[in-house]
Amino acid sequence: MKNIFRAIIALLSLACCTPNDGVDSLARVKSFKEEINKETELPSITYKEFLDNIYDFEHDSTQTWSNKSGRPVVIDFYATWCAPCKKLGPSLLELSDKYKGQVDFYKVDTEKEERLAMAFNISSVPTLMFIPKEGEPYLSVGYISKGEINQIIKELVKY
């Protein structure tokens, strides 16, 4: 019994003597997660970037929709708390890799970019906006499968 008690005391002493870098480790993990997220997320687009690069609806209501890159665009309007949005994210990321150089993909956090979401009457998430090279965009409200999105993108790329 004395030996068990001594072993417990020895282990506790060792535990107390080890440096506590838990806060530093937590900061490193958080930084690492942020780096991973940067590489595994679609680029965000702000209200101003949308006006500058896709469609300046504030100043010219007759302007045609276009992306300065000349490619079709897919925009994911989402919210961080939305489970279907989180489920949709990896599919969109895979499709953005598949159509790299052919279609531009962006995401819009509807809580951070309320003005942009309100401009298109986005009231439900997820909502995907598909903008062809020419013509009017169209919206898909609610979760849709990767296969369905792929079919829509194939149509966008045709024209």
Functional labels for PLM-detected ranges:
Residues 43, 104-106, 137-140:
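Structural signal for short hydrophobic segments within the conserved structured cores
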Residues 82-85:
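Hydrophobic heptad-repeat coiled-coil signature
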Residues 42-58, 68-73:
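Acidic, low-complexity mobile loops and tails
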Residues 70-73, 101-104, 133:
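Loop/turn elements at helix/coil->beta-strand transitions in domains of secreted/extracellular proteins
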Residues 1-51, 159:
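N-terminal targeting signals for export/organelle localization
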